[in-house]
Swiss-Prot record:
PANTHER family: ISOCITRATE DEHYDROGENASE KINASE_PHOSPHATASE, PTHR39559. One of its GO terms (cellular component) is cytoplasm. It comes from the Bacteria. One of its GO terms (molecular function) is AMP binding. NCBIfam families: PRK02946.1 (NF002804). It comes from Burkholderia vietnamiensis (strain G4 / LMG 22486) (Burkholderia cepacia (strain R1808)). This is Isocitrate dehydrogenase kinase/phosphatase.
Amino acid sequence: MNHFPKLLSSQIGFDIAQTMLEYFDRHYRIFREAAVEAKTLYERGDWHGLQRLARERITSYDERVKECVELLEDEYDAENIDDEVWQQIKLHYIGLLTSHRQPECAETFFNSVCCKILHRSYFNNDFIFVRPAISTEYLENDEPAAKPTYRAYYPGTDGLAATLERIVTNFQLEPPFEDLTRDIGCVMQAIDDEFGQFDAAPDFQIHVLSSLFFRNKSAYIIGRIINADRVLPFAMPIRHVRAGVLAVDTVLLRRELLQVIFSFSHSYFLVDMGVPSAYVDFLCTIMPGKPKAEIYTSVGLQKQGKNLFYRDLLHHLSHSSDRFIIAPGIKGLVMLVFTLPSFPYVFKIIKDHFPPPKETTRAQIMEKYQLVKRHDRLGRMADTLEYSSVALPLSRLDHALVRELEKEVPSLLEHEDDNLVIEHLYIERRMTPLNLYLQNGSDADIEHGVKEYGNAVKELMKANIFPGDMLYKNFGVTRHGRVVFYDYDEIEYLTDCNVRRVPAPRNEEDELSGEPWYTVGPHDIFPETYGPFLLGDPRVRTVFMKHHADFFDPALWQASKDKLLQGELPDFYPYDTSLRFCVRYAARFDATPDHDDGAGAAQRAA
């Protein structure tokens, strides 16, 4: 601080700081209550209730910020508080956080409230938390001993099998397990398959996070195995095999598999964390290299993730010298996309005007992005970070990019000193555009990319998402090889679409016409017409028809729509189904033919 006050004399400053913290505490109490409710809904198998809960939790933070801002404006005339008082508000707030269990999240909440009240010229060290003020190192839960951040187990005492069984039963899930002894046998077999002979060191132990991670129809046990100098991550998803009966579905023992389930293309977990920083630190030990911003986001604290990401960006800018450039690939009609080559993200801005045939508005596009934020993304739609008033140094912007910005989004630009301030943008993980991946790839790459593309669209379809624009350029390939959709301006709910077959041509003139001879409503979709846009490359066509010949059959799309209208929620797995115990160790399940969510026979046949 430029002028640290010798005395904190402002009673209003203290009252405002206390009010802001009370609203944050209310927010975090609701956040934790949602995770507790998730356990109850999971135990009941109430999947629609879990979806509703996840949607409501996403909007809860902004609702608390709005309530806090309104109170501060009504009772304290916050917009007209002078600088000295704002400085004291922050210092009082820091004092209130000294024994807090979520100080980093509380600081972010403070920033959110301030940014609604103050002009951005006040976004400096004196008034908001540009850097954290309270350390989260060694922060631990002061709740009863039964609820530490993680529990330690020592298999050397009772043996590994008994320890694994105790790990599962300690979560006290209400429904019974179909055959927990069988499931633990599968876990033991998977460990043996992965690591072979396992020589236990004197410090051999297993650490397990104390709360389950809920998402979709799974509850994940997350932990790590410590053996000498090795730290081995694991995740055990537990699922309902039928109503009211549970089973361990698999155990994931590779770091890359955990990185996928915590990926930016999945919805946020519901997890009860007394000390979120301790959970994030634990997860960093099993996924080293994964940014803390992404981990905070994946556990449902997306505002904290957004805050950390922006700090990461500023830090990267101060330690790099390359320039922002227009993103490679085909330019979009709706979004201007640019990137910093040394930073693995893209920046997307809605253009001021859209050429035909696009018929949409900025507000409609922003609502589409909100739809994706609220929806279950299933590992097939990229999460986005939304920012306002982003200041980038002009010296770091390529001249061609500046010209493009001034041409396409002049209404969103403001020059301020040596910075260009962009009023609104989205930031996403950078991926390889699927069209470039297929264009430049080997035969094996094409096989993988096309198979993944078809799987992605079919999974989105089952999740009630119609992408709208199916072109390959609107999909990307992640570093883990998954195909993910990222162009949302034409996205619709499949249940809002009319799936139609192309009517037979009435005559030869119709047949030769380059235009439809039939009426097309605003929500009509014609799967039979997608072929010319997707199958132009002979290599792609061969692979596509091998794996996804049914893609162009309206019956496939209509069947998914019908199931959705009947309230059916399909099963999704953020890992290859070949890893599921009922598939991988099918012989162990011969005595339980009803296992596997009612789809076991199909999975095993596959």
